[in-house]
């Protein structure tokens, strides 16, 4: 017996949730090389937004891989699955009005496109952290 159900309409709409906390949910997707500063930037952006009264959630790729994605490797299929799971989690936060900052290497356009498709174009803001490979290697 299949106990999975399609997504049902919530009793409280996204708009009502956003109104309650006086903000719109969205995703800031930070991408870049390992060691480029994604996590540091995400934490600082989250801190500054919090100081201004905004509710945020940081989804850090390293932390996600220590928990829900600990069974994944770094081959292309598992990288896609890592991003898929993270984007699905981000979408849940966004639908509740939370500004969600994701920081994942997400090295290919295909991988980032998957995240954008799951989250939705209007809620997805991609930021490439352009740090030289030499600087990343130092960190």
Name each region found by the language model.
Residues 1-103, 107-125, 130-135:
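Glycine-rich phosphate-binding loop of ATP-dependent small-molecule kinases
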Residues 137-139:
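GTPase G-domain guanine-specificity segment
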């Amino acid at each position: 017996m299949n106990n999975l159900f399609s997504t049902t309409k919530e009793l409280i709409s996204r708009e009502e949730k956003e109104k309650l906390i006086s903000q719109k949910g969205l995703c800031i997707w930070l991408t870049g090389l390992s060691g480029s500063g994604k996590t540091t930037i995400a934490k600082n952006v989250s801190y500054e937004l919090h100081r201004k009264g905004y509710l945020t959630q940081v989804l850090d790729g390293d932390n996600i891989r220590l928990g829900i994605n600990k069974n994944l490797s770094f081959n292309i299929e598992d990288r896609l699955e890592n991003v898929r799971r993270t984007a699905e989690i981000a979408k849940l936060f966004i639908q509740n009005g939370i500004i969600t900052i994701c920081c994942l290497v997400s090295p290919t356009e295909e991988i980032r496109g998957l995240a954008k498709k799951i989250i939705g174009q209007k809620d997805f803001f991609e930021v490439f952290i352009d740090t030289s490979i030499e600087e990343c290697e130092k960190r």
